[in-house]
Amino acid sequence: MKIKTAEFVISNSKVDHCPNSTLPEYAFIGRSNVGKSSLINMLTGRKSLAKTSAKPGKTQLINHFLINNNWHLVDLPGYGYAQVSKSTKKVFQKFITAYFKKREQMICAFVLIDSRHKPQPIDMEFMQWLGEHNIPFCIIFTKADKLKPKILDKNIENYKNEMLESWVEMPEYFITSATSKLGQDDILDYIEGINNSI
């Protein structure tokens, strides 16, 4: 898939205010500072479609982007160590879970994992929650360019082993680098394949 157009549509904190559309949606979510904004900009070929920040927890709203006029890319708030108050975190969690439970247009969630780190409990718990609620998801390993190939392979293998303790099989996953554009075609082709089948 080639991205010809990518337009910001709306930001909001309530699922009921999301676009009144039947277009398929693909949600991107992960721990704070996982490289989500950089990945979205890489996928769309736009340098500043999603705002990047060195400060974790910058994305605090549900952001919809219209891609090629036929699907929505949804940028969700990061979870984890976002530098926000506990009460704000609860609000995040509430509308994130509401989005996944209520938004029928949501076809697949892409859970971003920093490939440099060992499996994190918060990531495992979130994916477990998705599974328990029958929400389709894939894993995107980010920042692959920061590691030597052998270490990258080892880290991903660790994740596979961890996942297979609770899951029958490893979910679909992609290895990416916003710097080298590694994984760009694979993810976009995956989305295109789903769009063509629905």
Curated annotation (Swiss-Prot):
CDD domains: YihA_EngB (cd01876). It comes from the Bacteria. GTP binds at residues 30-37, 57-61, 75-78, 142-145, 175-178. The keyword rRNA-binding does not apply. GO terms for molecular function: GTP binding; metal ion binding. Its cofactor is Mg(2+). The keyword Magnesium applies. Mg(2+) binds at S37, T59. Keywords: Cell cycle, Cell division, GTP-binding, Magnesium, Metal-binding, Nucleotide-binding, Septation. Residues 22-197 form the EngB-type G domain. GO terms for biological process: division septum assembly. Pfam families: MMR_HSR1 (PF01926). HAMAP family: GTPase_EngB (MF_00321). Necessary for normal cell division and for the maintenance of normal septation. PANTHER family: ENGB-TYPE G DOMAIN-CONTAINING PROTEIN (PTHR11649:SF13), MSS1/TRME-RELATED GTP-BINDING PROTEIN (PTHR11649). Belongs to the TRAFAC class TrmE-Era-EngA-EngB-Septin-like GTPase superfamily. EngB GTPase family. This is Probable GTP-binding protein EngB. It comes from Christiangramia forsetii (strain DSM 17595 / CGMCC 1.15422 / KT0803).
